[in-house]
Amino acid sequence: MTEIQKPYDLKGRSLLKESDFTKAEFEGLIDFAITLKEYKKNGIKHHYLSGKNIALLFEKNSTRTRAAFTVASIDLGAHPEFLGKNDIQLGKKESVEDTAKVLGRMFDGIEFRGFSQQAVEDLAKFSGVPVWNGLTDDWHPTQMLADFMTIKENFGYLEGINLTYVGDGRNNIAHSLMVAGAMLGVNVRICTPKSLNPKEAYVDIAKEKASQYGGSIMITDNIAEAVENTDAIYTDVWVSMGEESEFEQRINLLKDYQVNQQMFDLTGKDSTIFLHCLPAFHDTNTLYGQEIYEKYGLAEMEVTDQIFRSEHSKVFDQAENRMHTIKAVMAATLGS
């Protein structure tokens, strides 16, 4: 086996939110993931976690996160064990503290995807092993590594990139893009109706990172201002998990913020890429899509099918990169 050097000594560390790491560490993980992607492509084994056991805790359903952690674990030589919402009793029949102490005795690392940021923080506090946040209502750090890896693959650099997020400014993707982008020296623009502006607490964290690392933060409801000369347009679903009752309200608020060809024309450049963490409502080929069309007459929601399937779209590279970046995090924090 050809050995490769991990980017930094992150052994024993947890990834709970982007600001847990420095700019150098975060970009180091991205570069490490790019290397691991080449290793996988070329069939070079990289069993950094041979003999390790990984707990995958999922309160929320997932396709990409579960698949990425599972394949990443196996590629690294570890054994992943999935524990779904019917298998774990976090805070219900058993406290998070007690659960963490039990799992920490049996597993070498723990992934958590759920609602509460406090839950993932407590898992890390009490388990005694590295814990990785696969998504909470507040932050989505593993997604950020994949997103900025995809941007770096397309442009060759991150510092000075203009990134525009269009949609609900209060969700975890918007929070994480602001903070991770600011840490990496990216100019992050959040384009959202004023009523969906991100909370000041998250904006303040991002602005502090921007002043430290050279990025910038813009919050605006002006689409033309937000996308002018931007390198990447990013959107997410208009309604997050657990908010399904708010579809009509969100559609009314965000229908003018759909990512479409007109928006891309406003960028003034041909090289702008499109990003989405998926799943995306870009057609009626799902039960959800059909239901939305029947209720509200919308065949496309946050992005048009034209843009989703265009050469601008890097969403499937982005999805693949979840696996490579998650692998980098696990190997760097748990590997030997």
From Swiss-Prot:
Main location: cytoplasm
Reaction(s) catalysed (UniProt annotation): carbamoyl phosphate + L-ornithine = L-citrulline + phosphate + H(+)
Protein's UniProt name: Ornithine carbamoyltransferase, catabolic
EC number: 2.1.3.3
UniProt record, GO biological process: arginine biosynthetic process via ornithine; arginine catabolic process to ornithine; citrulline biosynthetic process; L-arginine biosynthetic process
Function as written in the Swiss-Prot or TrEMBL entry: Reversibly catalyzes the transfer of the carbamoyl group from carbamoyl phosphate (CP) to the N(epsilon) atom of ornithine (ORN) to produce L-citrulline.
Family membership noted in the UniProt record: Belongs to the aspartate/ornithine carbamoyltransferase superfamily. OTCase family.
Gene3D superfamilies the record matches: Aspartate/ornithine carbamoyltransferase
Top-level taxonomic group: Bacteria
Entry keyword annotation includes Cytoplasm: yes
A cellular component term, taken from the record's GO annotations: cytoplasm
